[in-house]
Structures are given as structure tokens and as C-alpha cells.
């Protein structure tokens, strides 16, 4: 029988990073192991080693497989960095005492998947790396200088106001220096949607962050929506309302609601979304040979062609803007130009049909230039 280690793995090691991610979410879906840094065989060996040391265990039930921490792993992490882990590994919280119902586990899996997307996009996820924006009694919050993600459990620290929101589907909030993004993760299927619950979530963000805790940084208009999903096909289903009224996400809850995939494409675009300067550089590059934006136009646009066709930059996959653009073209029997990344082209071309010419940005070339 292997003996228990006396201390946690080094904080820079893959083993530590894996244990830390499991700690924050409660259960990491086995399918997400491929998204962590390192080769496949190396990561498999890391998992085997942690199991041998009795720090990690596999849990399989109802067709769901995930990784959970053992009591020994929790003890080591708490001893190593209590500021980082005590919130998740103490008491009867959902990440410490995990329920076995499929729906509860799926929510933990969606949170875990979101944390990986954020971490891979260089967004701060650990409590000792970001301001205590939602901590009760916090008086000196300061400003958000670098992107930081707070899970829905962290948000509920504020008090009973957030706890009382029933039916809200958000997994957390991403704070950048300029914006507040309420984050939703659909995973591999459309999710049920409650307009009233999500409007309450948005209103509370505006009250707690924009008016009470951080009015020096955020205006109420800074609150946006960010939607994560496993494939661009989900974006098509949302744009075409295939889920019916119970899945009607694009109901006006958020004027800006970007869709990103839970993969390398989405992680890179998330980095762009969090960096206003880089985003402006890309916009300027794409609009070089076009006429200026026309605010008086009846079709939403970012620029105009010399012959008067509206142009929409859709690389951020802002679904409400794309739908408004397409609807206006259809109603006015006009054509326009939509610019997006190559991995988004097929879905957006299928959605717009012959109403829009969809032009592709080479994603690989973009990444080499903007994130060398």
C-alpha cells in the first residue's frame, strides 16, 4: 500500500494544478483532462500517480465520470494554502460535500469546464490572486486591473440577496477592467432559460457592483452576457430558436451576449475579449479599407462598403447583434457583409443565407500576430 504524501505537490506542477482545479469545482469531468497543459500520456500518468498517492479518485455514476479529491488531498491543500482553498474545502459547501444527483454533478462539471476555459485564457480564478469583490465586509476593493472570474458560489458570499435568485443559470461572473460579463455555460446542449431570473441576476450585478461596491469603475451599462458552449452548432440553434420558449436565451436579457466555444478557439477569443486595446487593434485592421460606421443606418453596422452595403464585425459572435443585422437585411431586402473567424463561417453562413457575404479571418494567422 502506498503511503500518503506529507505535503502537497509543488504549486507549479501539473499534479498541483489538477488538484487545485478539482478543489474549486468539486468534481472535474474526466473529458476535460485533455484541455489541461501537457501531453496525453503525461497527464494520464499524473492522474495515476495522484491515485496511487490516494489524493485523487474517479467517480462514475449515471453515465458521468469525474475526478474528486480525497480527504487526504483536501487536508494537504488546506495546509499548503488556506487562503486559496478554505472557501471550497471547509464545511458543508457544495464543493466539499458533493451530492450524487446527476443534475447537481452536471452543474459542477459546467463550473469546472468554465474554470478551465478561464484559466487557459489567463483569467485569474484563485481567491488569493484576485480582489475580494464579493466578500462580506470587504471595504477596500480597489479596481479590477486584470481579468478575474468569480464562481456563482463566490458571488453568493455577498449575502442573502443573491442566494434568493431562483432558477438563475449563470456559473459566475467575469470582471475585466471595462466590463462585467455574467457567464453561462451550456456544455453540449441548450439550457433552460428563465427571463425573470436572469433579469434579476443582471439587476443585482448593476446594484452590487455598479452602484455599491465599484461605482468608480463600472457603469450599469457595463453588464453584458457571455455564453459558453461546446460547439458552434449551439450558436446556430440559439440564433434559430430551435429550443422553443423554454430555451429562448436571446430574449433581450442582455443587449450584448457573446458566444465562445469551450476549446482553444474560445480561449484565444476570450483573451481578445478581455483586452480592449488588442480588440481595437483588430477592429482597426479589419476596417482599414471600408467607409466609416453610419449610425443613421437602419441596419446595424460597424462600417460601410463604398457601394453602401453594411458591414458587421461578428468575430466576437455577439448573437443579438448578428440576429438584428440579419433581420434588418431580410426585412429591407438588402445584402450585407459579415466578418468572422474561419471556424465560425459555416454556421453564420448557414444562418444568414444569401443575405450576407460571410468573410473569414484566418484564425491561425490572427493568433500568430496577436498572441505570439
Question: Model-predicted segments: where are they?
Answer:
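Basic, Lys/Arg-rich alpha-helical nucleic-acid-recognition elements, primarily the DNA-binding modules
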Residues: 1-90
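Short small/polar-residue motifs
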Residues: 51-55, 165-171, 295-300
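Short secondary-structure junctions
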Residues: 54-58, 123-128, 284-285, 292
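Short, ordered beta-strand-loop transition motifs
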Residues: 58-63, 175-177, 304-306
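Exposed, interaction-prone assembly regions rather than primary DNA-binding/catalytic cores
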Residues: 95-195
Amino acid at each position: 500500500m502506498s503511503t500518503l504524501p506529507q505535503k502537497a505537490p509543488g504549486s507549479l506542477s501539473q499534479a498541483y494544478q489538477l488538484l487545485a482545479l478539482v478543489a474549486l469545482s468539486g468534481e472535474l469531468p474526466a473529458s476535460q483532462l485533455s484541455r489541461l497543459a501537457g501531453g496525453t500520456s503525461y497527464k494520464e500518468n499524473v492522474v495515476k500517480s495522484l491515485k496511487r498517492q490516494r489524493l485523487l479518485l474517479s467517480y462514475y455514476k449515471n453515465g458521468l465520470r469525474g475526478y474528486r479529491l480525497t480527504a487526504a488531498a483536501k487536508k494537504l491543500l488546506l495546509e499548503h494554502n488556506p487562503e486559496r482553498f478554505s472557501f471550497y474545502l471547509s464545511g458543508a459547501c457544495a464543493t466539499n460535500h458533493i451530492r450524487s444527483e446527476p443534475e447537481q454533478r452536471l452543474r459542477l462539471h459546467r463550473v469546472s469546464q468554465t474554470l478551465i476555459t478561464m484559466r487557459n485564457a489567463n483569467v485569474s480564478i484563485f481567491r488569493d490572486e484576485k480582489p475580494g469583490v464579493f466578500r462580506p465586509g470587504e471595504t477596500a476593493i480597489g479596481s479590477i486591473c486584470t481579468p478575474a472570474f468569480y464562481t456563482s458560489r463566490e458571488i453568493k458570499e455577498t449575502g442573502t440577496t443573491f442566494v434568493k435568485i431562483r432558477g438563475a443559470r449563470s456559473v459566475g461572473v467575469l470582471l475585466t477592467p471595462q466590463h462585467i460579463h455574467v457567464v453561462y455555460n451550456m456544455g453540449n446542449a441548450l439550457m433552460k432559460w428563465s427571463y425573470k431570473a436572469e433579469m434579476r441576476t443582471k439587476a443585482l450585478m448593476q446594484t452590487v457592483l455598479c452602484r455599491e461596491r465599484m461605482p468608480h469603475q463600472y457603469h450599469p451599462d457595463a453588464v453584458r452576457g457571455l455564453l459558453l458552449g461546446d460547439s458552434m452548432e449551439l450558436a446556430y440553434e440559439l440564433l434559430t430558436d430551435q429550443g422553443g420558449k423554454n430555451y429562448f436565451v436571446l430574449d433581450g436579457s442582455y443587449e450584448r451576449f457573446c458566444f465562445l466555444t469551450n476549446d482553444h478557439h474560445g480561449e484565444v477569443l476570450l483573451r481578445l475579449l478581455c483586452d480592449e486595446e488588442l480588440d481595437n487593434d483588430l477592429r482597426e485592421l479589419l476596417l482599414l479599407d471600408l467607409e466609416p460606421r453610419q449610425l443613421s443606418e437602419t441596419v446595424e453596422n460597424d462600417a460601410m462598403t463604398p457601394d453602401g452595403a453594411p458591414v458587421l464585425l461578428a468575430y466576437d459572435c455577439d448573437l443579438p447583434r448578428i440576429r438584428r443585422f440579419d433581420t434588418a437585411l431580410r426585412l429591407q431586402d438588402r445584402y450585407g457583409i459579415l466578418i468572422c473567424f474561419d471556424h465560425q463561417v459555416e454556421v453564420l453562413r448557414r444562418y444568414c443565407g444569401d443575405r450576407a457575404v460571410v468573410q473569414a479571418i484566418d484564425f491561425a494567422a490572427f493568433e500568430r500576430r496577436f498572441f505570439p
